[in-house]
Amino acid sequence: MDVKTYPVLEAAKNRTLLDNATYLEWYRESVADPEKFWGEHGKRIEWFEPYTKVKNTSFEGDVSIKWFEDGLTNVSYNCIDRHLKTHGEKTAIIWEGDNPYLDKKITYNELYDKVCRLANVLKEQGVKKGDRVTIYMPMIPEAAYAMLACARIGAIHSVVFGGFSPEALAGRIVDCESTFVITCDEGVRGGKPVALKENTDTAIDIAARQHVTVSKVLVVRRTGGKVGWAPGRDLWYHQETAAAEPHCPPEKMNAEDPLFILYTSGSTGKPKGVLHTTGGYLVYASMTHQYVFDYQDGDIYWCTADVGWVTGHSYIVYGPLANAATTLMFEGVPNFPDAGRFWEVVDKHKVNIFYTAPTAIRSLMGAGDDFVKRSSRSSLRLLGTVGEPINPEAWEWYYHVVGDERCPVVDTWWQTETGGILITPLPGATDLKPGSATRPFFGVQPQIVDSDGKVVDGAADGNLCITDSWPGQMRTVYGDHERFIQTYFSTYKGKYFTGDGCRRDEDGYYWITGRVDDVLNVSGHRLGTAEVESALVSHNLVSEAAVVGYPHPIKGQGIYCYVSLMAGEVGDDELRQALVKHVRSEIGPIATPDKIQFAPGLPKTRSGKIMRRILRKIAEDDFGSLGDTSTLADPGVVDDLIANRQNRA
């Protein structure tokens, strides 16, 4: 195919931190001598006791990943205290509310006060180093304070996206045996309240039935809405923090002490607790934030993600604050009050760097250029995209219409598991190709492997693996190291398998082609097909379900469900609606099925395995190339599925 290349813009070249020659030199060093390279760059954060060991990692056998392992530091100290002398009065967080008339600015001095008070409240309530604290919050500054307060005292935070259901929240509380929850009376999204405290109460009841008791709930008052209250367990955030001491010494943490657990979808139904540790994670998050976005002092930086996802952890909170940046937190949604909201916020706060997801770009593109054109966007210098591959059409629109052809687009590829960006352009160094994540970041060694496990060189297609560790890499699955090894290191021995398909072109640029396992990427968020299947099957009229992804114009991938009902039951639109509602309540709105096809039978092999390949093809309305169906126990089901498909072109 004919691929357009956009050379590095002169303006980007003139102010960049890294030009192409420097990128190539640093990259060569980082791969040839990672000890030396990261030994130098590890010093970008402050250490209470410096490290003497840099890298101690193995992708073989019991898989062990350690970086800077004898160093002592603290993430909260690095994100706040060390900036106070020179940047105390600088704005750390700009908060933009769901309501366009609501905003506030928090300086680094104020951030210190808020975080120390909250850290002292946690300590007074018995939270100790190593305890797990669940944070179930909307996009308000208190969510960032909560993360930083946990880091300050050595507690491990587990942030759960505010859009998840009580059942999903309970599962995450139980898995890490969390006894302390920080939440909010209600969230606000798109003008509507979100019942976070009510969901928390329900989740705590579910967790109690599984023998995990939450002893304290700290509640932020956001809307003043009426909420249930358990005296002795529930505490008001504003009352407790007002009475707390405004200073709290940071705990000295080993570089390999856990910082947070973040649950992500796997191909089996049970979400995995991805565990990130302290030193390597912060070095990598801050370094990628600085160089990928060409961040320089004074820039206003806005990542539109939610703190409930890894992008919010690394590129709203930890990366930017470690770099003394001004980071914008947005409570709202891109289309409220209308589809011009993002660009109004850019103008209002003079945003220089803007980082969002392809799904938002596609939906705003669909709303038309007028919403963009009524804003000036003259402050913008750099655009970024994250969460899923961006199709070239959306890339071009973003570059030409939003960026007025003067802002490089950094299309970043990474995962919850990687802690930070792995493959990305650098704005002053990399010629851009719409749809390509381009080249690896420092220390990252990608490899393309075919399905037989053979490494393929040059221009090639296959499965994306990484051959050596980098500091931001996850260390284990919380409480289940065996699952960590099985999921990531057993498919291709001695390599980290990303679960993504990938193409490398003749210039060595990488193009991510999407998941190759049973994981969907819906609006840039990962969702295991097994999770959606379990939710469907838990409905009393459903006997079996199979879920696959299909191309969706806005969300990237839509959710297509094949559902077999109990004997004697008949599928109709009313039942479809009921099943949609059921899945939403089991998992959350993010898992809303787009298509439900009632299927008397599913294509199975004689051993009973569902042939998802066939279901994917039918969902994609592409059944001319189904391949050999003779191995199916009942090949006749395929004709029925094709005849009743819900996705006709």
From Swiss-Prot:
Matching CDD domains:
ACS
* Modifications made to the protein after synthesis: Acetylated. Deacetylation by the SIR2-homolog deacetylase activates the enzyme.
Positions of post-translational N6-acetyllysine modification: K609
- Please tell me which top-level EC class this enzyme sits in: ligase
Q: Where is it found, in Gene Ontology cellular component terms?
A: cytosol
* UniProt binding sites for Mg(2+): V537, H539, V542
Q: What is its EC number?
A: 6.2.1.1
Annotated catalysed reactions: acetate + ATP + CoA = acetyl-CoA + AMP + diphosphate
Enumerate the Gene Ontology biological process terms: acetyl-CoA biosynthetic process from acetate
What does the record give as cofactor?
Answer: Mg(2+)
Q: What are the alphabetically sorted keywords of the record?
A: Acetylation, ATP-binding, Ligase, Magnesium, Metal-binding, Nucleotide-binding
In the UniProt record, does the keyword Magnesium occur? yes
Highest taxon, organism lineage: Bacteria
Q: For binding CoA, which residues are annotated in this chain's numbering?
A: R189, G190, G191, K192, T311, N335, S523, R584
Matching entries from Pfam families are given as: ACAS_N, AMP-binding, AMP-binding_C
GO molecular function terms noted in the UniProt entry: acetate-CoA ligase activity; AMP binding; ATP binding; metal ion binding
Give residues annotated as binding ATP: G387, E388, P389, D411, T412, W413, W414, Q415, T416, D500, R515, R526
Q: What protein family does this chain belong to? A: Belongs to the ATP-dependent AMP-binding enzyme family.
Q: What does this protein do?
A: Catalyzes the conversion of acetate into acetyl-CoA (AcCoA), an essential intermediate at the junction of anabolic and catabolic pathways. AcsA undergoes a two-step reaction. In the first half reaction, AcsA combines acetate with ATP to form acetyl-adenylate (AcAMP) intermediate. In the second half reaction, it can then transfer the acetyl group from AcAMP to the sulfhydryl group of CoA, forming the product AcCoA.
What's the name of the protein?
Acetyl-coenzyme A synthetase
- This chain is encoded by the gene named acsA1
